Amino acid sequence: MALLLTALVAGCAAVDRHPTLNYPDATASDAQAAAPKNKQIILNPFLDHRGDKSNVGTVKSAFGLRTTEVVPANDVSVWVIDGIKTELQNNGYVVTLGSSSKDTLPGASAAVSGVIVDVTCDSGHSGKVAVIGKVRKGNKEVLSKNYSAHGSAGFAMMPTAEACAKSLSIALAASVKRFVAELDGMLTSSN
């Protein structure tokens, strides 16, 4: 009985809480990659402006008490950039990584940068990702918009780091795909 009570209070806090955040791999059901567009995008860093950069969520006990934090095994900023780079390449763009929010190259179609506003996963492992995507053409900012999405790998009775990572991955994919679709529409309509 004491063991059961301890498990309920702890909320299974002994389970690993260090998920590795990955961007979803393309599957056979996804649309085929777009034909090369012969357009270059400079992908600059996304600044991490989350309120608490040390974790991506907390685990609570059955009584709603905070028991432990979910700390990603990898860098959230790199994870976001990898997701955006993947989607840009899947849409046929040539991607060059920049080093500052204003990096541009002569002949580049656009420079992309942004801000990471939120990356959180709750105890039921519903994930939320919010980024502000920015696009510059030449010296002019032509887009600055919030792209936010939720994702869920399903409710987890026994929360795991993998379930949290999968939910966040789903949320990031939804946010990034909307951002890249809007960027793509802007660049293809300006031909």
Each PLM stretch: what is its role?
Residues 83-91:
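Amphipathic alpha-helical segments
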Residues 12-35, 90-94, 142-191:
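C-terminal/domain-edge helix-coil "capping" segments
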Residues 66-74, 121, 159-166:
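Second-shell loop/turn segments in exported
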Residues 1-12:
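Sec-dependent bacterial lipoprotein signal peptides
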